[in-house]
């Protein structure tokens, strides 16, 4: 029999815990040791989920560090820069938020954009683990909730009020990086309308670390990414002025579904821990508004969700994992939801005959936009597998959740904890020793 190189669950959990300790800077965990040597917002939430079974206290520190960098307007920035650490571009000097943005924190260097709001899920997982521990651990988790409830509410209120000004139930993004799915085909047509002016010179860091160009965005794409920063800097990151200057403005259906779920989760926490009634009421209202906003985007026949280009005033139809946003938050009529599940489990996605594992590729293998090695244009992301599995379990789809967890662990059993994986061969790609991949494994293994 051929030798099976995979690790047992016990070995895998030990390696994942060791990885998180290795990436720990003391009060923050780097997203990855080389490519991402700082704290990323949604990475930090997933890291806290992975830390919770190991140490509720350390998981609380992770979220405390992130929230200490929250902007005065309520935004949680997508990067909190580690002090004295270089090696990532664009760094704090390029963002210049400390000198330009009135709302930026004075004690931390951050980026000037945001990322998906998965943090309430992390808070819930921390509280769930704390309930199984001793009194002192429960006290740590509950003290965190007391200390940070107002900050979590400001975060959700900023998204609901500043990024959904017309109350359509969909979050507007001003940069593809805000979606977390940086170079997804979802944004191709919106980026095509971004025409860079004269950019200050720059030297990328990502393609020095990941030398295979098929795994990373092109230089032309990077020019557009950086031009959007210049547009933001020109108005000093002012929420009121961004809509009048940004050449990238899209309503992100996947971000909006996550926000709906997060509002629902935070409302339930608020009820359980007797937070102000007005806060809980707002959270339930936002959960419903964004659930309805997601459903409004869906195809009448298949249930597939679409993004919306605000400037071009058109729907963005692409075959990516974001199509399945309504499966996260619910709200679809029964027949449409059944059709969407059939699409997910059929040959265009998880049921494609050539997939190494029955997992959700970031872009459909039958799409003309599919590139099996390139970032969000095809590879399978363990963190996305975790998110769908967790949401499916929450919705009562125990068998679907179990299958995703089972296949996710099979994929991760090589022990590389890669950022993403080639969908046909299972080859680990992108950054190795990725913290949120280790975190997903730790949560799955309990």
Swiss-Prot record:
GO molecular function: Glc3Man9GlcNAc2 oligosaccharide glucosidase activity; glucosylglycerate hydrolase activity
Induction cue: Up-regulated in response to nitrogen shock.
Top-level taxonomic group: Bacteria
Entry's pH dependence statement: Optimum pH is 6.0 (tag-less variant). Optimum pH is 5.8 (C-terminally tagged variant).
Reaction catalysis annotation: (2R)-2-O-(alpha-D-glucopyranosyl)-glycerate + H2O = (R)-glycerate + D-glucose
UniProt-annotated catalytic positions: 182 (proton donor), 419 (proton acceptor)
Assigned keywords, A-Z: Glycosidase, Hydrolase, Stress response
Regulation: Activity is not dependent on divalent cations, but it is enhanced by Mg(2+).
Xref: InterPro entries: 6-hairpin_glycosidase_sf, 6hp_glycosidase-like_sf, Glycoside_hydrolase_63, MGH1-like_GH
Gene3D superfamilies xrefs: 1.50.10.10
Membership in a protein family: Belongs to the glycosyl hydrolase 63 family.
Function according to Swiss-Prot or TrEMBL: Catalyzes the hydrolysis of glucosylglycerate (GG) to glycerate and glucose. Involved in recovery from nitrogen starvation by promoting the rapid mobilization of the glucosylglycerate that accumulates under these conditions. Can also hydrolyze mannosylglycerate (MG), with tenfold lower efficiency.
Identification of the protein by name: Glucosylglycerate hydrolase
């Amino acid at each position: 029999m051929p030798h099976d190189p995979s690790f047992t669950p016990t070995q895998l959990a030990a390696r994942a815990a060791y990885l998180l300790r290795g990436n720990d800077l003391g009060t923050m965990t780097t997203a990855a040791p080389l490519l991402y040597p700082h704290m990323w917002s949604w990475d930090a939430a997933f890291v806290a989920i992975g830390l919770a079974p190991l140490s509720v206290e350390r998981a609380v520190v992770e979220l405390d560090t992130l929230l200490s960098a929250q902007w005065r307007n309520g935004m949680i920035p997508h990067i909190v820069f580690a002090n004295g650490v270089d090696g990532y571009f664009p760094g704090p000097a390029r963002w210049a938020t400390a000198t330009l943005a009135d709302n930026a924190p004075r004690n931390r260097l951050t980026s000037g954009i945001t990322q998906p709001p998965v943090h309430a899920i992390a808070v819930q997982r921390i509280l769930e683990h704390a309930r199984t521990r001793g009194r002192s651990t429960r006290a740590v988790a509950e003290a965190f909730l007391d200390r940070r409830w107002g900050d979590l509410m400001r975060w959700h209120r900023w998204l609901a009020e500043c990024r959904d000004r017309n109350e359509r139930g969909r979050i507007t993004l001003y940069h593809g990086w805000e979606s977390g799915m940086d170079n997804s085909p979802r944004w191709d047509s919106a980026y095509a309308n971004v025409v860079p002016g004269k950019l200050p010179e720059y030297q990328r860091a990502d393609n020095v670390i990941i030398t295979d160009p098929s795994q990373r965005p092109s230089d032309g794409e990077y020019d557009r990414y950086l031009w959007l920063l210049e547009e933001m800097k020109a108005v000093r990151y002012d929420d009121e002025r961004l809509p009048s200057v940004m050449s990238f403005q899209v309503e992100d259906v996947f971000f909006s579904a996550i926000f709906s779920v997060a509002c629902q989760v935070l409302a339930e926490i608020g009820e359980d821990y007797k937070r102000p009634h007005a806060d809980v009421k707002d959270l339930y209202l936002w959960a419903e508004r964004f659930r309805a906003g997601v459903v409004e985007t869906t195809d009448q026949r298949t249930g597939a969700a679409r993004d919306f280009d605000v400037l071009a005033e058109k729907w963005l139809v692409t075959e990516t994992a974001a199509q399945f946003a309504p499966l996260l938050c619910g709200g679809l009529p029964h027949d449409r939801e059944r059709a969407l599940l059939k699409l997910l489990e059929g040959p265009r996605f998880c049921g494609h005959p050539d997939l190494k594992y029955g997992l959700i590729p970031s872009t459909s293998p039958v799409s003309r936009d599919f590139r099996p090695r390139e970032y969000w244009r095809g590879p399978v992301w363990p963190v996305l597998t975790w998110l769908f599995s967790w949401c499916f379990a929450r919705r009562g789809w125990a068998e679907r959740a179990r299958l995703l967890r089972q296949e996710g662990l099979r994929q991760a059993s090589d022990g590389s904890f890669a950022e993403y994986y080639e969908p046909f061969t299972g080859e680990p790609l992108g950054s190795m020793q990725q913290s949120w991949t280790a975190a997903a494994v730790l949560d799955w293994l309990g």
